[in-house]
């Protein structure tokens, strides 16, 4: 995204930056001259086609997730509604990054008069990406809270997490994240905004980690207590723990894919002139690729961890021209 993160493309300053596709800032140039491996300070080039391709793949995958959850009534549960919210956020992040690649290409090829309009479009895209990032974090936290309730408040769960209440929670998440994302971009020239975003990221991770430490420490004891009750409490608790493990994988992938970007922000505000920090920040395009990969990996995790969702995926795909492949696979 367009920012002054040591190698920004635009003269306007924003904290989210898409680099200059092979060029670098004056500050980076001066740092590179003083070191024998000055090439480290060259902004890593990634072909625009890569961003567009990843955006299209993410779009198709996450639309499949959303349609599957809407189609299958067995998936109409709080956890899957929150997963649907996460899928929307993932889709917007990747599609917006892909769209921004096109905007940047236009910005480089248009005249000065048209560039101001293109920059405004890019600012809108930045706001969408920032809002989607916040929505992703909040959706993951919501899934963690939902798993916590299913394990420790199993008997009261359906009274606590009603469909109406879940709908209100998701609506509030997106409303708050949209407003926050817009404000972050408007005031992105301020270092305080970057610090606020970094703080939110690590605070949410700390909250989720706290929930999981408590969940996995107490889960076995709680399962034993539920097991003495009539019905299928043990089976239900086993399914709930499977959902908790799925979320653990999702959070792990999220951290791996987003951590380099937030480390980039930390370096930007703490050591922008340090040669090692500049070298790390020169790989910003790679960190954007990781972010887009997160949006592609998440639907694969859903499919691998949920037999019901996997079954629905197959039903949807078989309704289209690819149905012949489904018939062929069912014969062998």
From Swiss-Prot:
The protein's assembly and partners: Homodimer; disulfide-linked, also forms higher order oligomers. Interacts with GNAS. Interacts with ATRNL1. Interacts with MGRN1; this interaction competes with GNAS-binding and thus inhibits agonist-induced cAMP production. Interacts with MRAP and MRAP2; these associated factors increase ligand-sensitivity and generation of cAMP.
Localization per record: Cell membrane
Gene from which this protein is expressed: MC4R
One CC-aspect GO term: plasma membrane
Claim: S-adenosyl-L-methionine is one of the keywords in the record: no
InterPro entries: GPCR_Rhodpsn (IPR000276), GPCR_Rhodpsn_7TM (IPR017452), MC3-5R (IPR001908), Mcort_rcpt_4 (IPR000155), Melcrt_ACTH_rcpt (IPR001671)
Extracellular side: 1-43, 107-123, 187-191, 272-280
Pfam families: 7tm_1 (PF00001)
UniProt keyword list: Calcium, Cell membrane, Disulfide bond, G-protein coupled receptor, Glycoprotein, Lipoprotein, Membrane, Metal-binding, Palmitate, Receptor, Transducer, Transmembrane, Transmembrane helix
Binding-site list for Ca(2+): 100, 122, 126
Disulfide bonds: 40-279, 271-277
Membrane-crossing residue ranges in chain numbering: 44-69, 82-106, 124-145, 166-186, 192-215, 249-271, 281-304
Membrane topology classification: Multi-pass membrane protein
Main subcellular location: membrane
Protein name (Swiss-Prot/TrEMBL): Melanocortin receptor 4
CDD domains: 7tmA_MC4R
Cytoplasmic side: 70-81, 146-165, 216-248, 305-332
Family: Belongs to the G-protein coupled receptor 1 family.
GO MF: melanocortin receptor activity
Residues with lipid group (S-palmitoyl cysteine): 318
Function: Hormone receptor that acts as a key component of the leptin-melanocortin pathway at the intersection of homeostatic maintenance of energetic state. Plays a role in regulating food intake: activation by a stimulating hormone such as anorexigenic alpha-melanocyte stimulating hormone (alpha-MSH) inhibits appetite, whereas binding to a natural antagonist like Agouti-related protein/AGRP promotes appetite. G-protein-coupled receptor that activates conventional Galphas signaling leading to induction of anorexogenic signaling in the hypothalamus to result in negative energy balance.
The UniProt record lists the keyword Transport: no
Glycosylation sites: 2, 17, 26
